[in-house]
Regions:
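Basic, alpha-helical nucleic-acid-binding regions used in initiation and control of genome expression
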Residues: 1-102
């Protein structure tokens, strides 16, 4: 039986691979989407160190996105837990990913 943590990471990785595909198709749109989410969260008073790291990546080194979105490093796994791409994947498709990851 898979642990909850392993299942959560598997689902997260699958969703972020879709974000990576979108990034390869329309990088500016994906970057803008992530920055807008970060800005909105900051305006609501939601903040954490990883959000600042995401902002740096999106603004200054977006070429790192593929490694973060689908990589297996500790940093990639950690950053995906605070991803600024919430809402990028349509809800119906997201639900399909969640149910097929069981």
């Amino acid at each position: 039986m898979k642990s909850y943590h392993h299942l959560h990471e598997t689902r997260s990785l699958r969703m972020h691979r879709i974000v990576e595909e979108r990034y390869r198709e329309t990088p500016d749109d994906v970057i803008r989407f992530g920055l807008e989410n970060l800005e909105r969260w900051q305006q609501r008073g939601v903040d954490c160190d990883d959000f600042r790291i995401w902002e740096e990546i999106l603004r200054f080194v977006p070429q790192r996105l593929p490694e973060i979105l689908s990589g297996s490093s500790e940093e990639a796994v950690r950053l995906r837990q605070s991803s600024p791409f919430a809402g990028l994947i349509p809800e119906a498709f997201r639900q399909q990913i969640l149910t097929t990851s069981l």
